[in-house]
């Protein structure tokens, strides 16, 4: 822990913590300070001027990062018949119906994302208490309840990131790995910021995007100039 503290302190000395940086400069600082012995995730935190306790101020959506997430995502699909075959051909890791429900109820959740065809939702709905807290419950708003199984599987494995505002009005999401090039990370950051701006709810009043910060798993946060990022 002492070494982590020293490394964090040293990283903070490489940039001005009060300066608002462009996305490109923020990425450069964060990437240069990602020196852990593993490939750190680069994370974006956005403070929004919303109160998610009100339904008309909820912010939720999905963004297909142009350069992917750098993660290997295992996908489970609830489907039957031709759609189950389609899911398998698309590369889904687990495909099933009642058998998949029993697997999940038994605690065997060896996947990261769940997709379902609409006709499977009465079955999937019985798993709400298990999948909901894990953020894995299929939802048509983010494209995981769909007849377009192939696209949903490809998006999930190819870089789709779901975002949802937390109680404090903050969205946290990974935008890649420290091993990505600066250009790839910056492009991913811009794509996610743009998606969140487009997801502005009707009930949002006043300043919508209040603060943006970028960090690596073990590194300090670097502040981003919101006015430049939102208009970029």
Curated annotation (Swiss-Prot):
GO biological process assignments: regulation of translation; translation
Domain of life: Bacteria
HAMAP family hit by this protein: Ribosomal_uL1_B
Matching CDD domains: Ribosomal_L1
Family matches, as InterPro entries: Ribosom_uL1_bac-type (IPR005878), Ribosomal_uL1 (IPR002143), Ribosomal_uL1-like (IPR023674), Ribosomal_uL1/biogenesis (IPR028364), Ribosomal_uL1_3-a/b-sand (IPR016095), Ribosomal_uL1_CS (IPR023673)
Keywords: Repressor, Ribonucleoprotein, Ribosomal protein, RNA-binding, rRNA-binding, Translation regulation, tRNA-binding
A GO MF term: tRNA binding
Described purpose of this protein according to its UniProt entry: Binds directly to 23S rRNA. The L1 stalk is quite mobile in the ribosome, and is involved in E site tRNA release.
Subunit-level organization: Part of the 50S ribosomal subunit.
Annotated protein name in UniProt: Large ribosomal subunit protein uL1
Family note: Belongs to the universal ribosomal protein uL1 family.
A GO cellular component annotation in the UniProt record: cytosolic large ribosomal subunit
């Amino acid at each position: 822990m002492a070494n982590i503290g020293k490394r964090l302190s040293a990283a903070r000395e490489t940039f001005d913590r009060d300066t608002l940086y462009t996305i490109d400069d923020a990425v450069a600082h964060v990437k240069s300070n990602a020196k852990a012995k593993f490939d750190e995730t680069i994370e974006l935190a956005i403070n929004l001027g919303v109160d998610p306790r009100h339904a008309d101020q909820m912010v939720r959506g999905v963004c297909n990062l142009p350069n992917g997430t750098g993660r290997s995502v295992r996908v489970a699909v609830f489907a039957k018949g031709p759609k189950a075959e389609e899911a398998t051909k698309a590369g889904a890791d687990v495909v099933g119906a009642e058998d998949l429900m029993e697997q999940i109820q038994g605690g065997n959740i060896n996947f990261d994302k769940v997709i379902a065809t609409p006709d499977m939702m009465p079955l999937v709905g019985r798993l709400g208490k298990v999948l909901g807290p894990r953020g894995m419950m299929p939802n048509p708003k983010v494209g995981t309840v769909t007849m377009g199984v192939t696209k949903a599987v490809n998006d999930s494995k190819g870089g789709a990131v779901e975002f949802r505002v937390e109680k404090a009005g903050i969205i946290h999401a990974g935008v890649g790995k420290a091993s990505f090039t600066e250009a790839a990370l910056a492009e991913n950051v811009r794509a996610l910021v743009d998606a969140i701006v487009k997801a502005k709810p009707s009930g949002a009043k006043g300043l919508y995007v209040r603060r943006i910060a970028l960090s690596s798993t073990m590194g300090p946060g670097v502040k981003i100039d919101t006015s430049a990022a939102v208009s970029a």
